[in-house]
């Protein structure tokens, strides 16, 4: 099963990917993680990516796609994979389709986790992180016993820059600008299924599994 997970920041893609990994025993491929690994291991494409990164430039699509191809060739992807964070644009989706075609494979499902912006803002801006041990809390959904203090180590809790409202609004704006055409792209290929990302982790997981097994 070859699966793409789409969804805005804070929608719970990472959580759902971890649950799907356990259930289907296929790897999650996060572009950020494999890019860093390819650079560290100095794979052919990792070496190319490093030259762009060292120059402070964005790594071009063809290099990112090449790194994904290197990853898909590894044995643990033989029964499928979950792509998280890629593709983000129609051009990337086209490039991915060509790579998969060359491997004799194709995407089976594209799951879009849908959550409205105000819900996402509440989820993300309420996050707090311990400066000392890194444990996460949420002011509404998982508050610490004492305000601003970590339950585990009594460290100070703070709000990461990425979790601030102005930053999150910008991230959402960029996401929707990039991804709206991608949603249409996969809808036109009859691959896209949308799942409401509201409810417990288990409830959302069950909705996704129902689609995958349907």
From Swiss-Prot:
GO terms for MF: adenylate kinase activity; ATP binding; zinc ion binding
Pathway assignment: Purine metabolism; AMP biosynthesis via salvage pathway; AMP from ADP: step 1/1
Transmembrane annotation, as ranges: none
Enzyme category, top tier: transferase
Region listing for NMP, in residue ranges: 30-59
InterPro entries, A to Z: Adenyl_kin_sub, Adenylat/UMP-CMP_kin, Adenylat_kinase_CS, Adenylate_kinase_lid-dom, P-loop_NTPase
BP GO terms, sorted: AMP salvage
Localization per Swiss-Prot or TrEMBL: Cytoplasm
Family annotation (SUPFAM superfamilies): P-loop containing nucleoside triphosphate hydrolases
LID as annotated region, ranges: 126-163
EC number: 2.7.4.3
Keywords attached to this entry: ATP-binding, Cytoplasm, Kinase, Metal-binding, Nucleotide biosynthesis, Nucleotide-binding, Transferase, Zinc
Pfam family, one: ADK
PROSITE patterns per the UniProt record, alphabetical: ADENYLATE_KINASE (PS00113)
GO cellular component term of the entry, any: cytoplasm
Binding site for ATP: 10-15, 127, 199
Family in the record: Belongs to the adenylate kinase family.
Purpose of the protein: Catalyzes the reversible transfer of the terminal phosphate group between ATP and AMP. Plays an important role in cellular energy homeostasis and in adenine nucleotide metabolism.
Name this polypeptide is given: Adenylate kinase
Organism encoding this protein: Geotalea daltonii (strain DSM 22248 / JCM 15807 / FRC-32)
Taxonomic lineage from the root: Bacteria, Pseudomonadati, Thermodesulfobacteriota, Desulfuromonadia, Geobacterales
Gene name of the encoded protein: adk
């Amino acid at each position: 099963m070859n699966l793409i997970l789409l969804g805005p920041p804070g929608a719970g893609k990472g959580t759902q990917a971890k649950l799907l990994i356990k259930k289907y025993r296929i790897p999650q491929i996060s572009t950020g993680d494999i890019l860093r690994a390819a650079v560290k291991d100095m794979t052919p494409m990792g070496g190319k990516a490093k030259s762009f990164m060292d120059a402070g430039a964005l790594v071009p699509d063809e290099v990112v796609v090449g790194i994904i191809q290197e990853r898909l060739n590894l044995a643990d992807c033989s029964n499928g994979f979950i792509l998280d964070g890629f593709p983000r644009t129609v051009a990337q989706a086209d490039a991915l389709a060509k790579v998969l075609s060359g491997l004799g494979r194709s995407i089976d499902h594209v799951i879009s986790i849908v959550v409205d912006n105000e819900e996402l803002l509440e989820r993300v801006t309420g996050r707090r992180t311990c400066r000392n041990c890194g444990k996460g809390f949420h002011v509404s959904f998982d508050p610490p016993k004492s305000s601003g203090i970590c339950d585990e180590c009594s460290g100070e809790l703070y709000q990461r820059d990425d979790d601030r409202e102005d930053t999150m609004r910008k991230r959402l704006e960029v996401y929707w600008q990039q991804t709206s055409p991608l949603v249409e792209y996969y809808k036109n290929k009859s691959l896209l299924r949308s799942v409401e990302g509201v409810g417990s982790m288990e409830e959302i997981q069950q909705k996704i599994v129902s689609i995958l097994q349907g």
